[in-house]
Amino acid sequence: FITNISLAQEVKENKINKVNYATVIMYHRFGEKRYPSTNIRIEQFLEHIDELLKPKYNIIDIKDGLKAIENIKLVRDRSVIITIDDAYSSVFKYAWPILKKYNLPFTLFVSTDVIDNKIPGYMSWEEIRILRDNGVTIGSQTKSHPHMHNLNQDQLIYELSKSNDRFIKEIGSKPKIFAYPYGEYNLN
């Protein structure tokens, strides 16, 4: 999944275009053939990384991308943010070693229930702490990964506060970044 976050402003500084937007590439699973709609083959992921390592691209941390949107800091044109949703175990097993090898920043969005319940196929809190300790940005994706547009305000508050409580206990702070499960939201 690829999206652009922007407020479309472009400035030229020293012949390098500076902009206040970045392209976000979102991944879910790596090397898990039985989930074709959310999986990327490892060979294909390596091809993505090879392309993104070319000088025409600028891989940035999500925090820098958000600063660009807020017009606090412009980023180079063709800046790319890598995000990974859902904290599947294949992230730690396959994607993390590749991203670490090339020192590429990324954000991992986590729903806390599947981690707390030790659901097979998901990362552990220990693995999430290892990523955090190595500079990976950890974001929230609620407690139970619900379809948020179906929730009332009390349910939304519950999902977010319980998730934040778990993050504080397990990694020492609540995430400053949030991703809507399924990309769905309501105006509450």
Residue ranges and their predicted role:
Residues N20-E32, R76-V80, Y88-L187:
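Metal-dependent polysaccharide deacetylase catalytic core of the NodB/CE4 family, i.e.
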Residues S6-V80, Y122:
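N-terminal pre-catalytic segment of deacetylase/amide-hydrolase enzymes
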Residues F1-T3:
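Bacterial N-terminal signal peptides
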